[in-house]
């Protein structure tokens, strides 16, 4: 997958209105990326919980348990075999694995997600730096505008 091409814009050449629009766009992108990080962390936590649950299966043959039908409805059940688990590998596909294989799968997923979180965090940091630059340019333009207004006011007073 190719990265989107970054466009370099001379912030000094933009008007205050354009700077405001760019600032709002960058803030929205930061918000979107932050939400992505939260979703990735949520997914990572699910894999961590799954790994821990698989670890808790050892020595549970014949034990009674509750089997979830939905997030709020459970049926009583009994563990017949605790040597194999069904692992959701994505898009509705499940693979039967040994507990250790399932835990390794979860570890790999957590590692992959952590790498993605780091990449997204790097992008957020870059966007924040861009946002700081935009705000600084806007503030300097506002200061310059105020100076010009003050000079014009002084000139008008002197002409009278």
From Swiss-Prot:
GO biological process: protein folding; RNA polymerase I assembly; RNA polymerase II core complex assembly; RNA polymerase III assembly
Chaperone among keywords: yes
Pfam families membership: Prefoldin
Keyword Chaperone: yes
GO terms, molecular function: unfolded protein binding
Known function: Binds specifically to cytosolic chaperonin (c-CPN) and transfers target proteins to it. Binds to nascent polypeptide chain and promotes folding in an environment in which there are many competing pathways for nonnative proteins.
Family from the record: Belongs to the prefoldin subunit alpha family.
Known partners and oligomeric status: Heterohexamer of two PFD-alpha type and four PFD-beta type subunits.
Protein name, UniProt field: Probable prefoldin subunit 5
Source species: Dictyostelium discoideum
